[in-house]
């Protein structure tokens, strides 16, 4: 499994729209679901810092994720620009695999 984590600081006036767009049934998840190797998205709200969220995007493999992005780069960029105004900041925390899964 391959997991990508993103951290967001959300504009308070846009929070409901953000949750709808970035949640497990939101537009990002629907976009990624075109790939059979996409396993799902979780949206976590920070209990200690209001307006801060994490997304966890799960894929079968790094290759599946990279391949999807390569094939759909312009659509990804268009969707990213569309939702840019919902956040005050967006940080890619990292990409992770299951420990011990390789070799």
Spans of features found by a protein language model:
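Short amphipathic
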Residues: 7, 95-97
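An amphipathic, aromatic/His-enriched active-site/gating alpha helix that lines ligand/cofactor pockets
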Residues: 17, 23-40, 58-93
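N-terminal presequence-like segments and adjacent domain-start helices
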Residues: 8, 15-16
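Short, well-ordered beta-strand segments in beta-rich or mixed alpha/beta enzyme
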Residues: 2-9, 40-71
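Short, low-order "capping/linker" segments at domain edges
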Residues: 97-103
